[in-house]
């Protein structure tokens, strides 16, 4: 990778992390920085963006950023959005093709992370799209994780979306 490409990736990632929509647009449209340019840490702007900024996500995705990019631990932007509870960002990612059934390095789907953190609205959104029979590295399904946490509201949501496996 060329030093110029890394510097461009650093600038784009920095602007995305700060939530600076104008700078992200300038870099993408005027300087023609590729939306999946890697920064010096091997991450894209979508991976390091300020998750509360759906405008950043939209701009990057409209310019061709991959919604399914994973870091070395297997974490993708949908994992991060689910874990941190940013439903609006998660919806934007899914609308642009993010796969909610790709596990991270621990075998967890985004819904496992949302259950673990107690993000009810995120669990409700993901339940219809997720493989609820998928087990994480500890062998737990999202429902079993909710039961283990004693989170009855999440248990109710998940049970409402359960379909018997074939």
From Swiss-Prot:
It is found in: Nucleus; Cytoplasm. It comes from Homo sapiens (Human). The modification N-acetylmethionine is found at residue 1. ANK repeats lie at residues 41-69, 73-102, 106-135, 138-166. Interacts with CDK6. Pfam families: Ank (PF00023), Ank_2 (PF12796). Signal peptide: none annotated. InterPro entries: Ank_Repeat/CDKN_Inhibitor, Ankyrin_rpt, Ankyrin_rpt-contain_sf. GO terms for cellular component: cyclin D2-CDK4 complex; cytoplasm; cytosol; nucleoplasm; nucleus. GO terms for biological process: autophagic cell death; DNA synthesis involved in DNA repair; negative regulation of cell growth; negative regulation of cell population proliferation; negative regulation of G1/S transition of mitotic cell cycle; negative regulation of intrinsic apoptotic signaling pathway in response to DNA damage; regulation of G1/S transition of mitotic cell cycle; response to retinoic acid. Keywords: Acetylation, ANK repeat, Cell cycle, Cytoplasm, Nucleus, Repeat, Tumor suppressor. Interacts strongly with CDK4 and CDK6 and inhibits them. PANTHER family: ANK_REP_REGION DOMAIN-CONTAINING PROTEIN, CYCLIN-DEPENDENT KINASE 4 INHIBITOR D. This is Cyclin-dependent kinase 4 inhibitor D. PROSITE patterns: ANK_REP_REGION, ANK_REPEAT. The keyword Oxidoreductase does not apply.
């Amino acid at each position: 990778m060329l030093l110029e490409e890394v510097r461009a990736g650093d600038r784009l990632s920095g602007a995305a992390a700060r939530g600076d929509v104008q700078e992200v647009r300038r870099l993408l449209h005027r300087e023609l920085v590729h939306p999946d340019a890697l920064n010096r840490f091997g991450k894209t702007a979508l991976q390091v963006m300020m998750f509360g900024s759906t405008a950043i996500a939209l701009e990057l995705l409209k310019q061709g950023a991959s919604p399914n990019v994973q870091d070395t631990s297997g974490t993708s932007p949908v994992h991060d959005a689910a874990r941190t509870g940013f439903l609006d960002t998660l919806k934007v990612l899914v609308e642009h093709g993010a796969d909610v059934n790709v596990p991270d390095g621990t075998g967890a789907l985004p819904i496992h992370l949302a259950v673990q953190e107690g993000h009810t609205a995120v669990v409700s959104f993901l339940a219809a799209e997720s493989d609820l029979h998928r087990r994480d590295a500890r062998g737990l399904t999202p429902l079993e994780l909710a039961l283990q946490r004693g989170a009855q509201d999440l248990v109710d949501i998940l049970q409402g979306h359960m379909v018997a496996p074939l």
